[in-house]
């Protein structure tokens, strides 16, 4: 049975679309659980649901970035390299996270942290920073060189970096300063602000990525037979 290249763009786009829908659903679920917990109204969820939620929130970005890389034309080397780098970094982070959660790595030994755990933690942090840099490079390139949905995706990726940077340093310091001595209130405000803003920008970024993939797939050749 023959099939045309037209089916390849369709598969790539629908895979990205389903991954984006799954990410949105579980991102909102995770946000609701976190915010309710911060406000003292914990939501009781089954262990299986929480495990599925955690896995999908890690796996769906890998799928989206991989599909975005496949959708890009061969001549867009910088974007392809950046998207491939983000995909690889997310995959390595996912694998390291599984090792930690599955107790494949001994976390404590005689009351002390083994050197292997320290090394893997530093590697995980370096990989995360590398993915942020690669994502920012892709975003800046998209903003400066493209129009339409690609341009909007670039803005979204830059927003992701800004929210990540603000959530790491700027917002916590500002909220603690404004909250004065009410430390618990400050912590609650910081957590809610970071969670809501992060969820919003990531959902917008992956939505625009799905739109950009659709645009790229419409421009792909589709009249050859495999």
Task: Explain the meaning of each model-derived region.
Residues 1-67:
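N-terminal topogenic module of multi-pass integral membrane proteins
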Residues 3-13, 66-79, 136-154, 202-224:
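Cytosolic juxtamembrane helix at the C-terminal end of the final transmembrane segment
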Residues 14-17, 21-24, 77-96, 153-166:
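Transmembrane alpha-helical segments of multi-pass membrane proteins
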Residues 29, 162-226:
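C-terminal transmembrane-bundle signature of multipass membrane proteins
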Residues 37-49, 103-123, 171-193:
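Interfacial non-cytosolic loop connecting adjacent transmembrane helices
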Residues 47-62, 119-132, 187-199:
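Alpha-helical transmembrane segments of polytopic membrane proteins
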Residues 92-150:
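Membrane-proximal helix-loop-helix units in multi-pass membrane proteins
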Residues 126-141, 147-174, 197:
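Alpha-helical membrane segments in multi-pass integral membrane proteins
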């Amino acid at each position: 049975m023959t099939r045309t290249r037209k089916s390849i763009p369709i598969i790539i786009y629908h895979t990205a679309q389903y991954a984006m829908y799954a990410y949105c659903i579980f991102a909102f679920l995770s946000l609701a659980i976190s915010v309710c917990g911060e406000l003292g109204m914990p939501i009781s969820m089954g262990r299986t649901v929480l495990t599925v939620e955690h896995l999908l929130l890690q796996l769906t970005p890998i799928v989206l970035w991989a599909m975005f890389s496949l959708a890009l034309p061969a001549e867009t080397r910088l974007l392809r390299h950046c998207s491939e780098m983000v995909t690889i970094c997310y995959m390595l982070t996912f694998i390291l996270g599984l090792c930690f959660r599955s107790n494949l790595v001994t976390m404590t030994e005689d009351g002390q942290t083994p050197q292997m755990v320290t090394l893997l933690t530093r590697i995980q942090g370096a990989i995360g920073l590398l993915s942020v840099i690669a994502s920012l490079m892709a975003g800046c390139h998209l903003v400066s060189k493209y129009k339409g949905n690609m341009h909007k995706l670039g803005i979204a990726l830059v927003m992701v970096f800004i929210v990540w940077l603000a959530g790491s340093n700027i917002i916590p310091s500002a909220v603690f300063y404004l909250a004065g001595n009410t430390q618990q209130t400050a912590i609650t405000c910081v957590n809610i602000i970071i969670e809501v803003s992060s969820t919003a920008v990531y959902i917008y970024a992956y939505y625009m990525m799905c739109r950009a993939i659709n645009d790229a797939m419409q421009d792909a050749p589709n009249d050859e037979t495999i």
